[in-house]
Each structure stands twice: as C-alpha cells, then as structure tokens.
C-alpha cells in the first residue's frame, strides 16, 4: 500500500498489471489496507497465516534465489510454500498473476481490534466487484488467531 501511495504522490498514477490486480489495488487504496493477489493454480491444501519455521524458504517476486527465513516471521503459506513474508509486504514469485490465471487469492491485512470493519468492507466490496465486473465465482473468508487457515474444495 505504501508503494502505491508513493507512486501516486509522485504523479505516476496507478500501475497497470492486469484488470483483476488493478481492481485489488484500487480497493486497497480506497480502504488504505495492504492487499496482495496470488495465483492459486498450484495450491491444493489451502492458505494459512502462521509463523515461519526452521527450513522455510521464500522466493522473492522477480527473484531467482531462495531466501532462508528465520523462525517467527509472519507469513502466508500454502502448505510448506511461503507465499508472502512480513504479512503481505513481500510477495513470492510463487503465485505470480499471469494472463491465464483463473484462481486468485486476495489477502487483506488488518487488525481485529483496530480496523476489522474496514477489512470486512474491503473484502465485501472486492467480492462484489469481482462478481459484477468480471463474472467471477468467489469464496470469502476471514482469518484471525482463532481461524488461521482457509481450506477449499
């Protein structure tokens, strides 16, 4: 979110990645919430928010070399594959949105005691626009300390 606001403040406007990611960026800016977008084509086990563990590695977006994570960093994981580190701040090359992407996960970061209402409003608006504009089928969830994982079939 910081990079988007900085880009706009410098007069560079919104970046165009693809229409679905652009929509996510617009919702992210509207609600001032960090949000990512991940291709789920290789994900079969669901997504979880957890602390990194010994042996976890991370392939940075645009990178070619895996980084070894220290224990205790907040990550989004698909099984043992780390999709983001430092919440949604650093996205992995795994899950890059491509023109043929058809299954997308949009993590929206927030805090239950601080901005839960905004997170839920952003989630609901994004879902409705994905349906109305793109004709998408959607599945939504809300992950927190009591519900750290989302599984689908």
Regions found by a protein language model. Give the residues of each.
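Non-transmembrane, aqueous-exposed alpha-helical and coiled segments at domain scale
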Residues: 1-153
């Amino acid at each position: 979110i910081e990079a988007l606001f900085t880009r706009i403040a410098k007069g560079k406007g919104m970046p165009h990645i693809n229409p679905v990611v652009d929509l996510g960026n617009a919702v992210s800016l509207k609600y001032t919430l960090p949000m990512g977008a991940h291709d789920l084509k290789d994900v079969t086990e669901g997504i979880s928010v957890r602390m990194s563990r010994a042996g976890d590695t991370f392939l940075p977006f645009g990178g070619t070399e895996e980084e070894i994570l220290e224990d205790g960093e907040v990550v989004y994981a698909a099984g043992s594959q780390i999709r983001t580190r430092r919440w949604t701040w650093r996205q992995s090359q795994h899950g890059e949105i491509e023109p043929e992407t058809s299954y997308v996960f949009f993590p929206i970061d927030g805090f239950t005691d601080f901005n839960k209402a905004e997170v839920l409003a952003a989630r609901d608006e994004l879902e409705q626009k994905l349906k109305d504009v793109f004709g998408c089928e959607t599945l939504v969830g809300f992950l927190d300390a009591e519900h750290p994982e989302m599984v689908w079939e």
